[in-house]
Amino acid sequence: MASSLYQQLISQNYYSIGNEILTDQQTTETVVDYVDAGNYTYAQLPPTKWGARGTFKSAFNVSNITGPHTNTIIEWSNLLNSNGWVIYQKPANTTKLFKHGPETYNSNLAAFELWYGKAGTSVTSDYYSSLQNNEKTVTATSDSLILFWNEGSTVLANKKVNFSWDMGGMLIKPTRGNRVDICMANMNDFNSSIFNWEEWKHEFPRSDVNINVNMYTDYYLASEDPYTELKALQQPNITTFEMKMMKIIRNGSINLNEVVSKDSLWQEVRYARDITLECKIESEVVKGGGWGYDYTSVAFKTVNHTYTYTRAGEIVNAHVTISFNNMKERSYGGSLPTDFKIGRFDVIDTDTYMYIDYWDDSEIFKNMVYVRDLSANIGGFFYYAEMSYYFQIPVGAHPGLHSSGVRFVYERCLLSQQFTDQVALNSMRFIFRVTESNGWFMTSGNINTRRIASGTGFAYADGHTSQTVGNITFISLIPSNPNYQTPIASSSTVRMDLERKINDLRNDFNQLANSVALGDILSLATSPLTFANLLESVPAIASSVKDVAANVMKKFRNTKMFKKATKAKYSEFIIGDLLEDVTNVARNSNGMNFDDITSAVMVSTTNKLQLTDVDTLSEIVARSADNFIPNRSYRMIEDGIVYEATPKRTFSYDLTTLQQREFDIDKFMRLASKSPVISAIVDFATLKAMRETYGVGTDVIYKLVASDAPTILSFIDNNNPLIKSRIEELLRQCRL
């Protein structure tokens, strides 16, 4: 099948970064870091702790601790080779950790069972539950590890040790023959430089030659004493900061207008205002195509946010645009089709800059044309909330991406200008720099499950809003006579020029679409149509590929085609929705489809229009995606029966006889979810006419039903009037 230009745009091969290609061509630097993962490769532990606290320093610089391991069996023979530590992240609730022994209690066989008991709970052994013995239940007054065991003459005993660390466990040592020592110790604090793992120990034989150790939760293993690593893991970085206090006495209102100088035509006015800034950060998660495990990107959007506040008794309507610069890029995932992966996700990290472009409806922005002595005193932001996003993969638990806090410090203020679809507005740009963050991490499921990746910085936000206050002052040159108005005070319409260009081009485009040769259109539709083809067709546009791609993508994201193509479960939709959604389903590899015809018309026509700007090209791409060939039909084939859906009706027919049959709506829905969906380029009426007029065979009918491109092209080349008439009918629908 031809590589549809629209399909490339839907699958996000081209995307915009930063501030969606700013009009002022500001720097949008992206820093890509290659990080030495160290022992996270083995331990997969986050260097952070959830919450608004310091960033924890990692000490896993050697591969001593490995895991987390998910296998449910540790063979007894592996315990006899050398000393080994079994380590656990402290569970959230009371849970069984491991057991060695038969399936049910047997007084003739030694056994032991390890539990984690959360403070304030009672723990009752599963293995020894059938015994009438008080030792089978232990009350945990603090977080504890509890070992239940029987061996030799001991019918049942238990050992409890404190588990105050975030991560800890026990030592298992080989002794004589086929026996091991289970060693336990109270894990209270990290005050000493060494740790005695053998405060208590007991020697155990193997229960039976066929019995190993059953593991009930994820665990880590260490072949050398892990105390140093566990100690360092819990010690946060310490930042020394200086605090100062001062008393400020204000003798007048901060919100004032002061005339600095004045003559007959002009006056200089100093404006001083209190100001409230709000920061809203929001991520955009873009899902790729394929099996449903592939996510293209997780990026921070440029956010437009409005809010109100009171300034000196006046209600102020404020508008801000929040964007970022100098972000880090990360990726995650495997290579197989069913491996969950993220192609790229942005991370706000140290030295990332946040830009807040601010304007409000007060008089100061109407008079902000010629300005000097601009200064601002703005507080910083600590943007904090516990935010998570869970990726909806088809099978298994949904992996989660988690972030919590990031601190922004104010650096400087500049004059700026914002362009919207309606007006151009003067504004102020407040620049903030990131100085610290709580870090991010990913989990295999909910937030309490295994960590699969982590790092410093801030990786996801759900639209939470934070606030800071400050004041601004500047001197503006304005007319002495208030009846004079500057152009910016009455605003200027930006979009009017684009609409005029589109109107001028519409008639030319539609005439050209009529005049393009039918064979040329179909030949182009069956060739690989890429974004490069589109750029080659409009050489008059003097912009970089990146700028053009970003602007086209920005416009295309608002089309109905783009929004409909993300739906995956077609069985949940009515027929009308299905017709707009099936374009994202795999088709026959040799088949022609409607999207390839529409993009071929567009590419073959735009090279004759002498386009000179990116906005006009983007508008044509978006309008052609939504408006070309509005009357589309789709079909599925199974066991010689064709199921067809058009905008007005649904029907089915026998492929051999072309006799209509009863339409099975349930089967149609199942096929639409699982089977290749074919664009009905040659409709049913044309198929019947071909059979009755030319007596074509079943094999040719099948190829026409399947929209086989070589077959359709051969009929076009031979000037078949029925096929030509059908294709021309489709092309006549291609109107801007």
Curated annotation (Swiss-Prot):
One annotated Gene Ontology cellular component of this protein: host cell rough endoplasmic reticulum
InterPro entries listed in its UniProt record: Rota_A_VP4, Rota_VP4_MID, Rota_VP4_MID_sf, VP4_helical
Pfam family, one: Rota_VP4_MID
Coiled coil: 495-515
GO biological process: permeabilization of host organelle membrane involved in viral entry into host cell; virion attachment to host cell
Keyword Membrane: yes
The entry's keywords: Capsid protein, Coiled coil, Hemagglutinin, Host cell membrane, Host endoplasmic reticulum, Host membrane, Host-virus interaction, Membrane, Outer capsid protein, Viral attachment to host cell, Viral penetration into host cytoplasm, Viral penetration via permeabilization of host membrane, Virion, Virus entry into host cell
Annotated site residue numbers, Cleavage: K231, A232, K247, I248
Cross-referenced HAMAP family: Rota_VP4
Recorded family membership: Belongs to the rotavirus VP4 family.
Protein name: Outer capsid protein VP4
